[in-house]
Curated annotation (Swiss-Prot):
Keyword hit for Signal: no
Keyword annotations of the record: Cytoplasm, RNA-binding
A single Gene Ontology CC term: cytosol
GO molecular function terms listed in the Swiss-Prot or TrEMBL record: RNA binding
SUPFAM superfamilies named in the record: Small protein B (SmpB)
Family stated for the protein in its record: Belongs to the SmpB family.
Protein name, UniProt field: SsrA-binding protein
Matching InterPro entries: SmpB, SsrA-bd_prot, SsrA-bd_prot_CS
HAMAP family hit by this protein: SmpB
Organism: Bifidobacterium adolescentis (strain ATCC 15703 / DSM 20083 / NCTC 11814 / E194a)
Gene: smpB
Compartments it resides in: Cytoplasm
Pfam families in the cross-refs: SmpB
GO biological process per UniProt: trans-translation
Length: 159
């Protein structure tokens, strides 16, 4: 079987970009079992309500991510919401651990995707947005959409 090329996302955490201001992004590997990979190849995963923790031994874990059981699996299937270990360099984990000690910073998963046949997760160091920040960013997005719509309409009228 040929390796899949490209980085088409399997799952995205859409709410993360709304609730958090992204400061820095990282790419991490993910330790999975065989049935989890097969389930991901079917495109079945959810990062909603998921978060990342760093334990005392300096290991990062993805918690709350839902990878449903593989449909054709046997009794040897995986638990859908188990903790999954993230693979990063020790220096990167130390840096993230120091930065999360600062007030208001957290580490969140943004997306899951295949890269060269391996599952990767895009994680971000982020700061939580206040309610007025969320409203302001929504207003800015709406203004951009309206401006694009007006430009498209003006271009149609010129022709």
């Amino acid at each position: 079987m040929a390796k899949e090329q490209g980085t088409k996302p399997i799952a995205q955490n859409k709410k993360a970009r709304h609730d958090y201001a992204i400061e820095d992004k990282y790419e991490a590997g993910l330790v999975l079992t065989g049935t989890e990979v097969k389930s991901l190849r079917e495109g079945r995963a959810s990062l909603a309500e998921s978060f990342i923790t760093i334990d005392r031994r300096g290991e990062m874990w993805l918690e709350g991510a839902n990878i449903p059981e593989y449909l054709n699996g046997t009794w040897n299937n995986h638990a859908p919401k188990r903790k999954r270990k993230l693979l990063l360099h020790a220096a990167q984990i130390d840096k993230l651990a120091r930065q999360t000690q600062a007030k208001g910073f957290t580490i969140i998963p943004l997306s899951l995707y295949f890269k060269d046949g391996r599952v990767k997760v895009e994680i971000a160091l982020a700061r939580g947005k206040k309610e007025f920040d969320k409203r302001q960013s929504l207003r800015e997005e709406q203004d951009k959409r309206e401006a694009l719509r007006a430009m498209r309409y003006a271009n149609k009228q010129v022709r």
